């Protein structure tokens, strides 16, 4: 399976996270030197009025609110340029499933380490994900973390 095959697969409609994992698992060079990356993105749907999952949300790429579909992604890298493989994702749809982006962060990270047996030594993420609950989970899973600098005076999300 080539990198292009993964890209083509992701472009297909109705791909599940489990199907994605089955496709990319043989491509991973998983080791204790690997890292996981958690990031979210917004698929711009500003001209779509009939799609159920479209909602207003912040887009870093746009620097403001846009109508779109939010996706939280978990990516694996072995540090070699070009070796970035999505291994899990979640659609951010709090009205449908009641889950926050932080819930998805914890679910995907736990699944990667406990079920998929990923050997990566650490996880990289934006400071938005640096909640107390998330950091405790990262430590419990035996991972190190790297995050963007926390802003002084800005309250980080703390979930119970």
Language-model-detected regions and their locations in the chain:
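Active-site-proximal, Lys/Arg-enriched surface segment
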Residues: 9-81
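Hydrophobic/aromatic beta-strand patches that form the interior of the parallel beta-sheet core
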Residues: 36, 85-87, 146
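Generic structural signal of hydrophobic/aromatic residues within well-ordered alpha-helices
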Residues: 6, 20-24, 28, 105, ...
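Short, conserved acidic/polar surface loops in the N-terminal third of protein domains
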Residues: 46-51, 85-88, 135-136, 158
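Electropositive, glycine- and tryptophan-enriched low-complexity nucleic-acid-binding patches
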Residues: 2-8, 13, 59-119
């Amino acid at each position: 399976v080539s990198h292009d095959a993964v890209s083509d697969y992701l472009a297909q409609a109705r791909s599940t996270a489990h199907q994605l994992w089955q496709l990319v698992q043989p491509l991973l060079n998983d080791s204790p030197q690997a890292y996981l990356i958690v990031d979210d993105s917004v698929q711009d749907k500003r001209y779509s009025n009939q799609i159920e999952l479209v909602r207003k949300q912040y887009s870093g790429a746009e620097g403001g609110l846009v109508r779109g579909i939010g996706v939280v992604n978990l990516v694996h890298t072995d540090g070699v340029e070009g070796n970035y493989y999505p291994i899990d994702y979640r659609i951010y749809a709090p009205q449908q499933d009641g889950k926050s982006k932080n819930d998805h962060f914890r679910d995907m990270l736990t699944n990667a380490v406990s079920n998929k047996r990923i050997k990566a030594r650490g996880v990289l993420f934006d400071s938005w994900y640096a909640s107390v609950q998330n950091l405790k989970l990262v430590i419990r899973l035996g991972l190190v973390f790297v995050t963007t600098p926390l802003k002084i005076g800005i309250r980080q999300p703390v979930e119970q």
